Design a protein with these regions (language model features):
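Short beta->alpha connector loops at strand-helix junctions that form conserved
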Residues: 93, 130, 156, 172-180
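Short glycine/serine/threonine-rich phosphate/pyrophosphate-binding segments
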Residues: 65-70, 134-141
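Generic N-terminal amphipathic, Lys/Arg-enriched alpha-helix
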Residues: 1-34
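Short, glycine/polar-rich helix-capping loops at beta-to-alpha or helix-loop-helix junctions
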Residues: 155-170
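Glycine-rich, small/polar surface segments that engage phosphate groups of diverse ligands
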Residues: 45-120
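Surface-exposed amphipathic alpha-helices with a cationic face
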Residues: 142-146
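A charged, well-structured terminal subsegment
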Residues: 118, 180-208
Length: 208
């Protein structure tokens, strides 16, 4: 009986942790999207116009955010919703030979800026993803994208760091220090960006 009571107490504690985590995972994105809805709509329109002009999405980030760059790219190239058009997108984090080659002699991580200088066209979209906006190579790549005339979109967390002060066309900062909630919110955000870009494509007169 004593063991059963102890297990029950442990279960209650675990349930409390689960509930707290869920509440945080709901409250932060709810506040973020309530505040940023207008800017998100503007970003979607700007992205849709670039795609309409023949542009591509070029996404990049480090670590777990490197896989987010791949995730958002595949969403555009291979839409999960039947009937939505495929749009050109590329994650700069995909090619291991290029990444390892560029990393040699680089003290600041993978120089995404070099890839943009070689691959990007002025009508393209650069999307940089970072947990705190402080990833030097991501911020430098966005600066290179600005120099080249790309539409620049940054996704960050915390206070946004240097990314938030870089004068990007759009910078969306999830104001929490919890990296899990930041990533969850970023994922929802780029799903929304994908969906609304297609809404604008369904009303192409708005893109002229």
């Amino acid at each position: 009986m004593m063991g059963g009571e102890a297990m029950t107490q442990k279960n209650v504690d675990v349930l409390g942790l689960v509930t707290a985590r869920f509440e945080r995972s709901v409250a932060v994105p709810e506040a973020f999207f309530a505040e940023q809805a207008g800017r998100i709509a503007e970003a979607c329109w700007a992205m849709a116009r670039r795609f309409h002009q023949g542009g591509r999405l070029l996404a990049f980030g480090n670590g777990a955010w490197a896989t987010d760059a791949q995730h958002v790219s595949v969403e555009f190239v291979h839409p999960v919703i039947v009937g939505k058009r495929a749009l050109p997108a590329l994650a700069l984090t995909n090619d291991s030979a290029i990444l390892s080659g560029l990393r040699v002699g680089s003290a600041g991580g993978v120089p995404f800026a070099h890839q943009l200088a070689v691959l990007a066209r002025p009508q393209d979209i650069a999307m940089g993803l970072s947990p705190d906006g402080c990833c030097t190579n991501v911020v430098e790549a966005l600066a290179e994208a600005q120099r080249l005339g790309l539409l620049t979109v940054g996704l960050a967390g915390g206070d946004g760091g240097p990314m938030a002060r870089a004068g990007l066309d759009f910078c969306f900062v999830v104001e929490t220090d919890d990296p899990l909630v930041i990533q969850e919110t970023h994922e929802t955000l780029y799903h929304v960006l994908w969906e609304l870009v297609h809404v604008f494509f369904e009303h192409e007169r708005l893109l002229r």
